[in-house]
C-alpha cells in the first residue's frame, strides 16, 4: 500500500527570494518531529528482527510494520525537501492519518491535519486531496478504520491557527542538519547511498526549519512498545505473510549498527557531513 496520496501535484508557495511560507515551516517541523519517533520505532523493529528469541511470526510482523514505516518516512521527507527547495519541486500530500500501530502519534497528526486544513482554506496552493486527506475527511484512515477521524472533527468543529508562529520561521541551517540526519538514517535502513537521497536544501536558503532532536522519545511517547503491538497482532486471524523475510529493508546487521551509530553521533552534537 502506498502512503503517498493520489491527489494532483502540489506547488508549494515559497517566495521567489527563497523564503518559506510560515505555514509551510509549521508543516515541515511537524513532519520532522513525527519522523523522529517513527525512526526510533524502526530501530526497535530491527532489534526484533535480529533478536535470537524472536519467533518467525514476530519477525514477519515486524517486517510488515517496518516496510510501511519506511514508505511513510520517504513520503514525509520528500514533502519537507520540496518545501525547502528553491526550485519548487512538485510533490504529493504526505500521509495525514496516524498509523494504527503508533496511536501515541495521533496528537501530532491532529496538529498536522490542522495545518493542511488552514492552508486549504486560506490559499489555492493546496487543492482538496483524493488520498490521505480525503480519507481523513471521510473518517477512514490508511488501515481502513472508520469513525475515529469523524469523532475528532465533531469534537473540534473549527480548526483555527495559533496566534503566534513557532520559532521555526526564524532559524538557521541547524534545521537542515536535522533533515540530513533523518535522510542518513533512512539510507542506513534501506541500504541506499547518501547521494541517492533527496537533495538537501540549498545552503544559501535564508530560512529553513528548526532542528529536531534525534534523541529517544520522551515519556509521552515511550509508553508504547512495538513488541507489545506485535504480541497483540499475533492473535489476529489468518497467517502472516512471511515472504518479506528477505526484504531489502532488513539487508544486514550492518544497517542496524550504522543507524545506531548515526543516532549516537547526533546525540553528541556532531554534524552529519558526507
Curated annotation (Swiss-Prot):
Subcellular locations according to the entry: Cytoplasm; Nucleus
Chain intervals with Polar residues compositional bias: 123-150, 157-167
Transmembrane residue ranges: none
Major subcellular location class: cytoplasm
Keywords assigned: Chromatin regulator, Cytoplasm, Nucleus, Transcription, Transcription regulation
GO cellular component terms, semicolon-separated: cell division site; chromatin; cytosol; nucleus; SWI/SNF complex
Region (Disordered): 123-167
Gene Ontology biological-process annotations: chromatin remodeling; regulation of transcription by RNA polymerase II; transcription initiation-coupled chromatin remodeling
SUBUNIT field: Component of the SWI/SNF global transcription activator complex composed of at least arp9, arp42, snf5, snf22, snf30, sbf59, sol1, ssr1, ssr2, ssr3, ssr4 and tfg3.
UniProt function note: Component of the SWI/SNF complex, an ATP-dependent chromatin remodeling complex, required for the positive and negative regulation of gene expression of a large number of genes. It changes chromatin structure by altering DNA-histone contacts within a nucleosome, leading eventually to a change in nucleosome position, thus facilitating or repressing binding of gene-specific transcription factors.
Designated name of the protein: SWI/SNF chromatin-remodeling complex subunit snf30
Amino acid at each position: 500500500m502506498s502512503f503517498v496520496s493520489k491527489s494532483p501535484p502540489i506547488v508549494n508557495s515559497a517566495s521567489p527570494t527563497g523564503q518559506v511560507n510560515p505555514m509551510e515551516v509549521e508543516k515541515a517541523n511537524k513532519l520532522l518531529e513525527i519522523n523522529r519517533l517513527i525512526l526510533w520505532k524502526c530501530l526497535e523493529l530491527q532489534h526484533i528482527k535480529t533478536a535470537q528469541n524472536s519467533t518467525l511470526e514476530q519477525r514477519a510482523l515486524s517486517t510488515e510494520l517496518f516496510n510501511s514505516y519506511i514508505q511513510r518516512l520517504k513520503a514525509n521527507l520528500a514533502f519537507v525537501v520540496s518545501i525547502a527547495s528553491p526550485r519548487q519541486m512538485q510533490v504529493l500530500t504526505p500521509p495525514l492519518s496516524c498509523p494504527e500501530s503508533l496511536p501515541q502519534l495521533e496528537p501530532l497528526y491532529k496538529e498536522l491535519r490542522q495545518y493542511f486544513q488552514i492552508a486549504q482554506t486560506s490559499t489555492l496552493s493546496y487543492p482538496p486531496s483524493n488520498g490521505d486527506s480525503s480519507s481523513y475527511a471521510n473518517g477512514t484512515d490508511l488501515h481502513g478504520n472508520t469513525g475515529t477521524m469523524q469523532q475528532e472533527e465533531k469534537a473540534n468543529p473549527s480548526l483555527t491557527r495559533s496566534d503566534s508562529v513557532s520559532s521555526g520561521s526564524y532559524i538557521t541551517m541547524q534545521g537542515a542538519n536535522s533533515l540530513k540526519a533523518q535522510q542518513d538514517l533512512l539510507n542506513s535502513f534501506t541500504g541506499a547511498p547518501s547521494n541517492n537521497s533527496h537533495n538537501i536544501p540549498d545552503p544559501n536558503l535564508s530560512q529553513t526549519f528548526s532542528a529536531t532532536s534525534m534523541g529517544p522519545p520522551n515519556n509521552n511517547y515511550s509508553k508504547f512498545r512495538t513488541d507489545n503491538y506485535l504480541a497483540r497482532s499475533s492473535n489476529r486471524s489468518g497467517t502472516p505473510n512471511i515472504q518479506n523475510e528477505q526484504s531489502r529493508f532488513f539487508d544486514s546487521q550492518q544497517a542496524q549498527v550504522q543507524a545506531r551509530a548515526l543516532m549516537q553521533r547526533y546525540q553528541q552534537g556532531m554534524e552529519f557531513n558526507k
